[in-house]
UniProtKB/Swiss-Prot annotation:
Subunit and partners: Homopentamer.
Membrane topology type: Multi-pass membrane protein
Source organism (scientific name): Bacillus cereus (strain AH820)
Location relative to the cell: Cell membrane
Keywords per UniProt: Cell membrane, Ion channel, Ion transport, Membrane, Transmembrane, Transmembrane helix, Transport
Xref: SUPFAM superfamilies: Gated mechanosensitive channel
Gene Ontology CC: one annotated term: plasma membrane
Domain of life from the UniProt record: Bacteria
GO molecular function annotation: mechanosensitive monoatomic ion channel activity
Main location: membrane
General function of this protein: Channel that opens in response to stretch forces in the membrane lipid bilayer. May participate in the regulation of osmotic pressure changes within the cell.
Annotated protein name in UniProt: Large-conductance mechanosensitive channel
Signal peptide coordinates: none
Length: 132
């Protein structure tokens, strides 16, 4: 599954990119809220009350807010995983539809129709010879 995710994330397919942008925009706020309001506090409890967003290194009056960076990476990973799962389900449904189309009996070609007519004529000739 990891290899599939890497292929998905790094291939240059325009449709996958478009789907990712649309789905990412649609679910971005929901996933961000999930991460910010549910997952991060749970991780904070497990890790001893750590809140990633407040993590920083202070140099005098300046601060490096690396906690926000960790939070942003975490948001990205969850959004990317959600998009990946959506595309995987979409591709699976699409491939099932294609398999169903392949199972349908195709219309006979002109050659097949002509060969069928020749077969029928030969049967008629053979049956008329048998009667005579």
């Amino acid at each position: 599954m990891w290899n599939e995710f890497k292929k998905f994330a790094f291939k240059g397919n325009v449709i996958d990119l478009a789907v990712g942008v649309v789905i990412g925009a649609a679910f971005g706020k929901i996933v961000s809220s999930l991460v910010k309001d549910i997952i991060t506090p749970l991780l904070g409890m497990v890790l001893g009350g750590v809140d990633f967003t407040d993590l920083k290194i202070t140099f005098g009056k300046s601060s490096i807010m690396y906690g926000n960076f960790i939070q942003t990476i975490f948001d990205f990973l969850i959004i990317a995983a959600a998009i990946f799962m959506f595309v995987k389900v979409f591709n699976k449904l699409t491939s099932k539809r294609e398999e169903e189309k392949e199972e349908e009996i195709p219309e006979p070609t002109k050659e097949e129709e002509i060969l069928g007519e020749i077969r029928d004529l030969l049967k008629q000739q053979n049956s008329s010879k048998d009667r005579a």
